[in-house]
Amino acid sequence: KGVIAWGASMGGFITQALAERFPKLIKSAAPICTAAGNVSSELTYAGDLLWGLKTFFDPSITVSGYADGPAGVGQAAQNLGKVAAVLRHISGTLTETDISKTWPATSPMPATIKAIPARSALTLVGLMAGVPTQSQHIDGSSFPGTETGFALALAPAIAIAQNAGYAAGLGIFATLDLERRVGGAFYDNTATDYAKRIADERASFNVALSGNDATNGLLSILSSPYGKRIAASDQGLNGLKAQLAHKGKALVPTITMTGTADMITPAGNSQWLVNKNLKNTKKFLPLWVVTADKWTKFLPTGSPDTSSTAWPSGTGHCQFSYDQTMTVAKLAAAAAKTGSVPSNASVEKTVAKVDGLLFDREFSMPLLKADQK
């Protein structure tokens, strides 16, 4: 008999920490859809998203530095409402021919920037933060009829808008909670190079960003007085550094599973663990829940149908099927008995029977933006 440690999301973070600190207490571990490292990169992901929304669309959005007591809770709730209002407006004006009307009334942007569709600014914000460009209703490649421009121009912004609401919620309430624990603001983007952040994506998302001139114009805002950077307090930064953190190496048989388009704990978290265990194949086994080729459906108007409440494979936060979850459980149980994860051949045979599940040690996902060098 033995103990298998299991946790999802921040529960996965705790599971990995337990396995590293007290490996003799457990036989195997399964941190799924987990945050990883010291959570700083995860919080930076959400903070960068909020800062981008604040900069382009509503300066009253709070990124960090919440008030104490009930006032801070109210501030966070109002903040979520402001983010939702921005995303609703942009999503509702995607096909507006008067470009200036695509911008929320709260936007402080000059007329030169408002000549660029707001969806392009939202796409930029999502890309620089690392928000997935596939979502519950958007596969990123489908288009209505012969309108191929949808996938190139509109789909990224729609997917980012759908995912950003969830990611912003994480950023708002996790920041509120952690600032109180560490004693101050910890988000800091004073040295962040956002142009470098999107260097790899600006070509592939060029149409969604409305071309090179528009992209350069939007990026210029981020280093102008409109894009006032935020500095952490010494107490907040030191307090964050003192929080629980991972070293990353699997000391007990460890199995991860993550959706490739998870918008709360993006797949880069699990990739961080993968990178720490590239040669540790007897103790570490990464599984991925991958997206299908297509799942977007369209209304007769040509707009995407967003009525479905189902989460397609690989999308959503910790949205795993029964078969996927039970596969992890069975593999973790087998590993607990032997002290090693099952062989590659055995795992391949098992995973081949489960829809949407991938085992491939050569497969990789981008790290979180803050972890990319």
Give short role names for the model-derived ranges:
Residues 1-373:
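C-terminal His-loop and adjacent cap/lid subdomain of alpha/beta-hydrolase
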